[in-house]
Amino acid sequence: MTRNHNARFAGVRGRMLIAAAAVLAPLAMASPAMAEHHPTGNFAPFKYCPLSNKATEICTVANTNAGEFTVGKKTVPITKTITLQGGLHENEKTEELEFIAAEGAETLSKTEETVPGGLLGIKAPKSWPLILQELFNEYVINKGLTGVTEITELAKPASAIKLNTTNLIFESGTALQLPVKVKLNNAFLGNECYVGSSSHPIILNLTTGTTSPPEPNKPIKGSAGKLEILEAGNLVRLTGGALVDNSFADEEGANGCGGFLFSWAVDPLVNEILGVPSKAGTNTAILKGNLEEAVAEAVKASE
């Protein structure tokens, strides 16, 4: 390891610790490779960190396990874990953190969620008994012919993800910039039905602070969560946090729905059902969960 690399390595860890210590002081006074790694103990969550990439200085894992994603007329509750993972490298010229794709797993997990109401937006009347509502929604709508699931996918290479740990901890500015597209799954819609695309992604500028969206949306507040510093300062853990953004737009709407032959007819139908394209101030992302970052050399040493 060169002297310059050591200096950058120390600088990245130093910035993490300075930011974390500043928060703790008042209390006291975002393509898979074949490589496999087996970190242990507190470092076990980083098994897909790109440790084979010499540029990796920090390992990061963020798990979203609650929240919601609203685009146009549709709100999809987050009920399953969505994982964003990979590595970070500090650009010595810009001092910005560059994201490196995970090894052995997706950088952004392709987690399938149910779209309430399915393709037609139908739900059981609220006047029905709760158990009857649940049975109707689950088995007649969600698992019927009109049932739709969605997967939020990364729309650009992992290097397009921007993570600012300092902003995240101090609840100010953009903590995570994430370019995504939403895949809709239904037999009628085909295999390539998306809202947003790689050429026109939905850009989420997520913050743990307070948003300032255009009307009709109102400001909402995120949270960094509870901060812990472990393993002699080599591991930073944030739990119970919330990343939010309600200023983003979907500029493209649906594309590829119904397959190559029928997308010209099906895309407008999906746009009408979902209310897309949708302008800034009409969409919302709330991602609740945990984030962990660790010094890559410490992760390696735990194997």
Label for each model-derived stretch:
Residues 1-35:
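Secretory targeting and sorting signals
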